[in-house]
């Protein structure tokens, strides 16, 4: 069987069932459930506390009219974080490396925030396309530039997380391959293994940061289009 550098991004199957589907279903055992035996579980208590703190900080700069977005933004953050971290396991598929999936999250959420602004405060939303104090000859050019900047926001959200995760996975793939190839030279192989360990820690941080950045940018777009 011929393997290439990009085979790690193909979705593995077992008995024609995608392994990602099985792994996502198994996650339900660690999510909070209304069961007396699990109400005092330490892991669930820590999860609930962390989710509460994150949601509180996320909604802090957003007006009260946008607080009903708390559940969907927190759920999106949890989904992205779980997918990113699971993708670091060997022989797994990371769905968030696919631009189509990330755009599927980014485009509807961005469009929803934009439509909220146009519905509730159309004047303020359109005013963002023209900075205050712009000279008259520059008005058409600046409106065009700001419009393009507005339209590429969902693309930037999707490309950012896909590019960062793909680059990190390729680095880990190359480093792990080098570790195995240098097994005949123990010193170099050990040094490469240490580098792989450090790179794995870095990629775990990147996985968490990218999920956080994705949701934070969406919250900023929501803040721009909601009123007090």
UniProtKB/Swiss-Prot annotation:
Pfam families found in the cross-reference section: ATP-synt_A
Positions of transmembrane segments: 13-33, 69-89, 98-118, 139-159, 194-214
Annotated membrane topology: Multi-pass membrane protein
GO biological process, one term: proton motive force-driven ATP synthesis
Classification via SUPFAM superfamilies: F1F0 ATP synthase subunit A
Chief location category: mitochondrion
Localization in the cell: Mitochondrion inner membrane
GO MF entry, a single one: proton-transporting ATP synthase activity, rotational mechanism
InterPro entries: ATP_synth_F0_asu (IPR000568), ATP_synth_F0_asu_bact/mt (IPR045083), F0_ATP_A_sf (IPR035908)
Function: Subunit a, of the mitochondrial membrane ATP synthase complex (F(1)F(0) ATP synthase or Complex V) that produces ATP from ADP in the presence of a proton gradient across the membrane which is generated by electron transport complexes of the respiratory chain. ATP synthase complex consist of a soluble F(1) head domain - the catalytic core - and a membrane F(1) domain - the membrane proton channel. These two domains are linked by a central stalk rotating inside the F(1) region and a stationary peripheral stalk.
Name this polypeptide is given: ATP synthase F(0) complex subunit a
Species of origin: Pelomedusa subrufa
Name of the gene: MT-ATP6
